[in-house]
A protein has these predicted regions:
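Nucleotide-sugar donor-binding/catalytic module of glycosyltransferases
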Residues: 1-233
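C-terminal subregions of glycosyltransferases and related glycan-biosynthesis enzymes
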Residues: 153, 157-169, 177-178, 184-355
Length: 355
């Protein structure tokens, strides 16, 4: 079996309605040297039949069905392990969903970025969010931008990636297999994509193509309780009741300070312990920034709501105006100034969005 340069792993589960469009867009890529491995996790709808029809029509498509359900975490891991085992000479790997849409030049563009610079370990495009019917959201935020090319210090890249990444978009980019294999894909924690990308940042840079080449059928953020159910079919481990960022810091400590997994990067166990502390530090700063931003927003909304007609009528009384001017306004101003300073300090550190 000739090995393609690119392998794509797609974990499938009960998305028969959107899967045909997803497969059509993947198989319409202008860059054609790839294999697509579809892994069904025991779907109860027509998902498997859709996948098998695609395999019958295109020799690049391969289909398998898990003997038992693995859940989202296990099936995503298998979506890396199986394609790279089937095609061990593959240089690049991508994770594909069973419900999104890819522009025909998506793969061509990302392969070009990785080919141009061996220091890049992940390439991804700008993302457009679409609804269940494929329509772009009218009130969607502008595409998230993050590119770490030019950042040469591994620890600085890790901190930068944590603050600025849009993990839910970037995880569907194109990875350099050698770098991803060294990290080991998803660890058994909640929000594993953020941890994976933080670890991967130690091994190289992230490059973003400056055009929208992927449409994400946005289904809302995955609540942590739902993640526990989808990831751990036999019951969530006790440590998943900890905040996800503490789980990540613990995983960093175990991997790099105890097991010495950073040896290939010249990161000893003592430096690995510092990495775990770095991760914990940037996590706490990020949470502080988000909390300060929320509090500032509430203060501004409360202030604006307070300027309604009843308050304006009260302010027509000179004595009320005097009290408000001397006592209320200075107190509100001091609170807003403090929150504004916290937000500004965090933004100078590069705090990002949790998309």
């Amino acid at each position: 079996m000739t090995s393609p340069r690119v392998v794509i792993g797609a974990p499938l589960y009960n998305k028969a309605g959107h899967l045909p469009e997803a497969l059509d867009s993947l198989l319409a890529q202008t860059y054609r040297d790839f294999a697509l491995v579809l892994i069904d996790d025991g779907s109860t709808d027509a998902t498997l039949a859709v996948a098998e029809r695609a395999a019958a029509a295109d020799p690049r498509v391969h289909v398998t069905r898990n003997e038992r359900r693995l859940g989202m975490l296990g099936n995503t891991r298998r979506a890396f392990d199986l394609p790279t085992t089937m095609f061990p000479a593959a240089e690049y790997w991508a994770l594909a969903s069973d419900h999104d849409v890819w522009h025909p030049r998506w793969l061509e563009t990302l392969v070009g970025l990785l080919d141009a610079d061996p220091g890049i370990v992940l390439a991804y495009p700008l993302t457009r969010r679409i609804d269940e019917h494929g329509r772009p959201y009218a009130n969607a935020k502008p595409p998230w931008r993050f590119d770490s090319r030019g950042c040469t210090d591994p620890r600085a890249r890790m901190r930068l990636a944590f603050r600025r990444m849009a993990a839910g978009d970037m995880i569907y980019g194109l990875f350099r297999v050698s770098a991803l294999a060294a990290v080991g894909t998803y660890r058994p924690v909640l929000v594993p994509d953020r941890l994976l990308l933080s670890e991967l940042a130690l091994r190289g840079t992230f490059a973003q193509a400056d055009e929208v080449l992927w449409e994400r059928r946005f289904r809302g953020l995955a609540e942590l309780e739902r993640q526990k159910q989808a990831f751990f079919l036999d019951g969530a481990p006790a440590y998943t009741h900890l905040p996800w960022w503490l789980q990540h810091a613990g995983a960093f400590a175990w991997a790099y300070a105890v097991r010495g997994e950073g040896a290939s990067l010249g990161i000893g166990r003592r430096a690995g312990a510092r990495l775990a502390l770095d991760y914990l530090d940037v996590s706490l700063r990020h949470r502080l920034w988000r909390r300060a931003r929320r509090l500032r927003g509430r203060a501004i909304r409360a202030r604006d709501a307070a300027l309604g007609p009843p308050v304006r009528a009260a302010l027509a009384v000179p004595a009320v105006r005097t009290v408000v001017r001397r006592r209320v306004v200075p107190a509100l101003g001091a609170a807003e100034e403090t929150l504004g300073r916290l937000v500004a300090e965090a933004e100078r550190e590069g705090a990002g969005d949790d998309r």
